[in-house]
């Protein structure tokens, strides 16, 4: 199995004590993970705690969202400059919950992607379709449109320093998951779309699956040719679940 990325998005969950317990479990078991890079995405208030507790472990830290602006009158926002002080490596860009709940559009996500790379951090660009869009046969047009917005803003070569996560919206937090064949079809299409403008970058690009990944579903999903790991939600709140994935 090729080197993979397994990223745990905690969303708006956990507490100080829960973070300590979760990170302790990951640290105790990370030595058993030889074929994947582990990344955790805590809520902002726990970044300093994660930084301190994960130092020297090889487990990476990411943030769930950022503001594309460096500083200013943006009440409630957190800049990349601030996030970088906590040894952050990755930034989620365009998660479906940001798009759906906060009405963020492709142009905003492209701006965050560009800003993330300007700070020498790695964006994980999240793309995916709703159930309605899938039933209308629009999956690939929606996903490729979300990617094209980034290509237009940053160029295809930018994917040398990025990761993509395909997250079918209908499979997030629902217990549903795309079949390995369905996921592979979209992952292959994503790679092909980027290859049209940046073939070398497309070949080396990590494309994660992010639709209710569990230990039970991970093995078959990760065996697919174009699936390079997972963006894990609920299962990442239990250390052993993430390790087993």
Spans of features found by a protein language model:
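Active-site-adjacent beta->alpha loops and helix N-cap segments on the catalytic face
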Residues: 45-52, 75, 100-111, 179-184, ...
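Conserved N-terminal beta1-alpha1 strand-loop-helix module at the mouth
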Residues: 1-69, 73-78
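Catalytic cores of alpha/beta
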Residues: 213-225
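Conserved small/polar residues in nucleotide/adenosyl-binding loops
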Residues: 243-245
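Active-site rim beta-loop-alpha module in soluble metabolic enzymes
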Residues: 123-200
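Glycine/small-residue-rich loop that forms an oxyanion/phosphate-binding "nest" at active or ligand-binding sites
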Residues: 60-110
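Hydrophobic faces of well-ordered beta-strands that scaffold small-molecule active sites
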Residues: 6-8, 38-42, 61-64, 91-93, ...
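Conserved, mostly hydrophobic/aromatic
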Residues: 11, 43, 83, 95, ...
């Amino acid at each position: 199995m090729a080197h993979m990325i397994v990223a745990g998005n905690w969303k708006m969950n956990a507490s100080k004590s829960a973070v300590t317990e979760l990170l302790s479990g990951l640290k105790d078991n990370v030595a058993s993970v030889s074929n994947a890079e582990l990344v955790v995405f805590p809520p902002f208030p726990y970044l300093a705690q994660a930084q301190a507790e994960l130092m020297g472990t090889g487990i990476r830290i990411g943030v769930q969202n950022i503001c594309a602006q460096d500083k200013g009158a943006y009440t409630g926002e957190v800049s990349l400059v601030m996030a970088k002080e906590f040894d952050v490596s990755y930034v989620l860009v365009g998660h479906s919950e940001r798009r759906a709940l906060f009405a963020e559009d492709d142009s905003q996500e492209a701006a965050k992607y560009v800003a993330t790379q300007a700070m020498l951090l790695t964006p994980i660009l999240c793309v995916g379709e709703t159930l309605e869009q899938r039933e209308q046969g629009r999956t690939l047009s929606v996903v490729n449109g979300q990617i094209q917005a980034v290509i237009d803003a940053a160029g295809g070569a930018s994917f040398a320093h990025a990761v993509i996560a395909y997250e079918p919206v209908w499979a997030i937090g629902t217990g549903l998951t795309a079949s390995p064949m369905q996921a592979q079809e979209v992952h292959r299409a994503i790679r092909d779309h980027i290859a049209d403008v940046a073939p070398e970058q497309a070949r080396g690009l990590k494309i994660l699956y992010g639709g209710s990944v569990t230990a039970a579903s991970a093995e078959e999903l990760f065996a697919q040719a174009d699936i390079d790991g997972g963006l894990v939600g609920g299962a990442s709140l239990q250390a052993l679940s993430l390790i087993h994935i």
